[in-house]
């Protein structure tokens, strides 16, 4: 902020998804997910919060997941981190008392690098059966939802956007 003179918006989009079953005990992967998916959003939000409050406006877009709305076998820890993103979004919205526009986006199956981080064979098999790779849509569609949220004037707040392929079950 000191270098560039100001910030009007931030998109907290970093995330990892090494899905696994609880019984697999992949604690290191769970810790990494918590560090990136929760702490990353917290630290990014904190980096701009006071600046936005001082200037009287700002926009925060947090990327969660449909896994932050529904838990599936193998996604327990990942879902917990994405539920946390929603909680951070709601809390930030309340703490800013209408000064900061906070949007939480919940993408479904889109073409990204996330699935490559899954190492648990049982989870890979479950996901293959669900066929999510076949219905995944281009990530640009999520980018358009981010753009939509950022284009709103100060009088409008888009709180939540759930975006998923039509063929994907919620």
Question: What are the residue ranges of the model-derived segments?
Answer:
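Conserved amphipathic alpha-helix within the SDR
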Residues: 1-6
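Substrate-binding pocket helix/loop in short-chain dehydrogenase/reductase
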Residues: 21-22, 29-34
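Active-site loop immediately N-terminal to the catalytic Tyr-X3-Lys motif
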Residues: 23, 70-76
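Active-site helix of classical SDR
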Residues: 45, 81
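Residue(s) in the substrate-gating loop at a strand-loop-helix junction
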Residues: 65
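Active-site-adjacent segment of SDR/Rossmann-fold oxidoreductases
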Residues: 70, 91-100
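C-terminal helical subdomain
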Residues: 104-105, 124-169
């Amino acid at each position: 902020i000191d270098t560039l003179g100001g910030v009007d918006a931030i998109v907290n989009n970093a995330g990892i998804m090494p899905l696994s079953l609880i019984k697999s005990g992949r604690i290191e992967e769970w810790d990494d997910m918590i560090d990136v998916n929760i702490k990353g959003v917290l630290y990014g939000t904190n980096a701009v919060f006071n600046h936005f409050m001082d200037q009287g406006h700002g926009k925060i877009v947090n990327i969660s997941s449909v896994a932050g709305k529904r838990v599936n076998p193998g996604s327990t820890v990942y879902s917990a981190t994405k539920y946390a993103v929603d909680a951070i979004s709601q809390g930030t919205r309340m703490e800013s008392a209408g000064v900061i526009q906070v949007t939480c986006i919940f993408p479904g199956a889109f073409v990204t690098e996330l699935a490559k981080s899954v190492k648990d064979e049982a989870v890979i098999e479950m996901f293959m059966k669900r066929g999510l790779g076949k219905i995944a849509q281009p990530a640009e569609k999520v980018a358009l939802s981010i753009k939509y949220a950022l284009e709103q004037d100060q009088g409008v707040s888009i709180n939540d956007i759930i975006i998923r392929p039509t063929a994907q079950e919620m």
